[in-house]
Amino acid sequence: KATLTVYAAGSGSLTAAWVGAAGQSVHQYSGDRVTTIDLGDVPKDASALKITADTKVTADVTVSRDGNGNQSDFALIGAAQTDDRSAAVIPSGLDGRVSVVNASLSSKQMHMTGYDDKGAAVGEKTITVDAGAAASFDASDLGKNVFAVAADGKGLAWGVRLSSSAVSDAKLAGIAYIGATPLMPLQERIWARSDMT
């Protein structure tokens, strides 16, 4: 199940559409307050959620899953950014599935490199994502023992869904997601002026 949380300074309406799956819905939100929207079950083929709003909004989505014995788990996923260079780390003992989303109106490419825990590159691939579409692959497709994934490319957002075979085999609910972290250097400008007095 998915719940969308939205904050905006002014009231308006938004369209929520699942990328990779059919269907969209329109919702109203109120200004200067948090609005919670129940999106129901996540479609099986969905890779991302695209939000189009009347005004500037801050949004995140909470995804939950139920397991055996009334056990459940959830993940809070913030809005993704498109950075020219970014990376994500896959915790030891977990498997990662990389999802890349193109919310633009034109096809775009991203070059991705996998690194092991010693910082050595173990594999790379370039993927092309059509406009308004998404692509996904297992981090292990980049090579053995992938500990981190780095990406170069403009206009694409991506992240890694984590999973554990031990959790799945125990029929427990487990859901986790790591968004890409920008690697672009922070810049700051300092103005200096001579004191003429």
Task: Annotate the PLM regions.
Residues 1-9, 56-106, 136, 156-197:
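Conserved functional hotspot residues at active sites or interaction interfaces
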Residues 2-4, 14, 24, 34-35, ...:
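Intrinsically disordered/low-complexity terminal segments and short unstructured peptides
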Residues 3-6, 14-16, 48-51, 97-101, ...:
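Short, structured motif recognition centered on aromatic/hydrophobic residues
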Residues 9-11, 19-21, 42, 54-56, ...:
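Generic structural motif
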Residues 13-48, 118-149:
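A cross-kingdom feature marking solvent-exposed beta-strand/loop segments within repeated
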Residues 15-20, 25-32, 60-65, 74, ...:
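Short, tandemly repeated low-complexity microdomains enriched for cysteine and small residues
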Residues 30, 49-54, 71-85, 101-103, ...:
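A broad, low-amplitude sensor of folded, mature protein cores
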